[in-house]
Amino acid sequence: MELTLGKLPPEILKRYLLGMVGAPSKDLLVAPSIGVDFGVVRVGGGSSPSLIVSSDPVTGVEERIGWYAVNVSANDVATSGNSPRFLQSVIMLPEDADERMIARISSEMSRTAKGLGMTIVGGHTELTPGLKRPIVVTTVFAFARSYVTAADAREGDSLMMTKSAGVEGTAILASQAPGLEAAVVKRARAYFRKLSVVEEAAAAFSTGRVRAMHDCTEGGVLGAAYEMSYASRLGFELMEAKVPVSGETRRVCSALGLDPLRLISSGTLLLSVEKGGEDEVAAAVRRRAGSRATVVGRFLRRGGRRTLVRIQGGSEPVREPPVDELWKVLHRMR
């Protein structure tokens, strides 16, 4: 099978990675699984909290890489309904890196972690042969007595999302989009400030109406819907007409020939909400996080179809997770 840039396809993950967990342990409560953002480990008996762990790389961006690196892993842990607490990092720098690059990345990470109430506990930093730009990998930890995973959605649940589609991709690609007015580029670049889902995940979880959550990272809103449905073994119906897409995102995507529903969107949270709880979840997210939460579809029966219902009419089957639109642009730049 020919591999492409970005996440490995599910069949490759299943064939080579998911079963390779080393020594089995009865303390592994949530094992590696496609579409699930984190692992969970029992660290004590009785009522002791469990340890939630997630890792993520930042590979496609250099500007504000420290900000992105902290937020993407913090977001994954936050989809459990719990606040991220501790972080470790691996920072791999290109051979031409200087002390200014090191200072910039480390200070960005420290400020971002402090803003989220997280402590950096260690890591590793090096100059790595062959790199053209830095790569930062972060691992984030939290302690939890209760949690949800992306595998807990149920048939009939409403599919909701926060903010709008393509948040992270809009910030990353704004400067690459030809023909945009300076004011549009400036507003789009500022989308990096929307990258965190920590507060909105906590707000939604606090209602008791949320069964599953997933961060819309690589593959965007459509990719996250696929992964959540795959993890929960359900079908889904995503209504393109209901997915919020900001004016800046539309302009950036139009200029670059991209689909906003398939564009990386850290900062957008996908939720599986029990029927009747939609208004309560939307109100909680608005009150605590200042974000909107919108119903954009629904989960279908076990093994049901996975479908994107297009604005112009008709439906499009979603048989595999989409390749992120960001990779198209990066491929053109190679």
Protein language model features and the residues they cover:
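Acidic, Ser/Thr/Pro-rich beta/coil linker or hinge segments at domain junctions
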Residues: 3-5, 9-14, 21, 287-334
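Glycine-rich phosphate/pyrophosphate-binding loop regions near the starts of catalytic domains
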Residues: 3-162
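Beta-strand->loop->alpha-helix junctions that form or flank phosphate-binding loops
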Residues: 30-33, 216-217, 235-244, 262-264, ...
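Solvent-exposed alpha-helices and their adjacent loops that cap or buttress functional pockets
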Residues: 31-33, 41-47, 113, 128-133, ...
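Aromatic/hydrophobic pocket-lining residues that form π-stacking "cages" and hydrophobic walls in ligand
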Residues: 73, 105, 109, 225, ...
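Active-site-proximal betaalpha loop/short-helix elements
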Residues: 94-96, 190-265
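Phosphate/diphosphate-binding glycine-rich loops and adjacent basic-rich segments that engage nucleotide
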Residues: 143-196
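Helix N-cap motif at beta-to-alpha junctions
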Residues: 273-279
